[in-house]
């Protein structure tokens, strides 16, 4: 299947994943209140750290490996089973950690059943093998499965979560929506994997340990400046501030997910091109990908800054007004994470230069931790937002500098300059509308509509390659 079709399918998957919390959060936040939302998020973050350890970088490492050998049925069978068994063994260790935390940490003992329920994420992640379907580029199945599971989860949420005491139901549905579909992944593997096409005694689980460990090191460092702010807010301040911060993070991640949808599709393709030494095609694809990232992330970042009050009130309610500044402070990470994610986890990783990504993220993690220590005690969730934005900026800058020898980003190409021009224009437009109408519903609606029209018009005027391709695609569809 082509990259365009895979991108559209994955974009549908990502958008449905973003739509689910955007629909549910306004409903649940008004019922469970900031302290209830904050407690679940606090526990989910801790479980997320454990899941990160038990996964050991497998979700990314395995995609690259499956993409390389997907045409070799025997080797594909063997590697898939080896990675599944390795992940399962590590998950058992993860549950030992869960038991230790339950018996020793007072903040977790506040609600042991809730924490135990959320730990189901570990089991479903181990059996899911999502990496296999990404490696063979079966994004059609991934998208359909996700839509079905999320729809059922949405229905269940409105049926079972009606009072503040329904926190347990909310947590269960959250787990179902996130990883419940992995059960289908596991049983569907029989369609692709012949479990009798190799000798079990020939399996070598540990050959995957070291390369996956490299990705784990990278993931754990990334997780530090992605999740540490939430954990530090919970321990240093309180769950209410975690709830405020979580509201801004959820909307920011939702917007960021739109930009990152392309990256999931491109990792197996980059890996295949690099493995076959098709470097000219590799560079051309990388150039297009970076330009797409810049062209989409810039207007989304600007829109997030101007529309933060409306978005917070719309999706979270007036009780979450303290989330507005945090969301605006964090808006630059849309651009920073989009660039570093594509450059590091797709381009450089496919080239085998993951050490550059590790060095960059170490610097960002250290900066994030130090800034959190200084800023959170005095500024709470605003300080956490500042720390995260600065850390992501440093990661991106260091990665660009260290990776320049292997791939250089042409920030001032004709195509990218068009995006800067168009973004500057919509900033002026939004400032004018804000002065004319004030910060209200009319500004929100007109601001979005007029910004989209003006931005696309400028790109069309400058003959942007993506807009021209979209126009051609639409014309072909209409005339068929």
Give the residues covered by each predicted segment.
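Interfacial segments at transmembrane-helix termini and the short loops linking adjacent helices
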Residues: 102-118, 304-335
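Membrane-proximal transmembrane or re-entrant/amphipathic helices at the cytosolic face
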Residues: 431-480
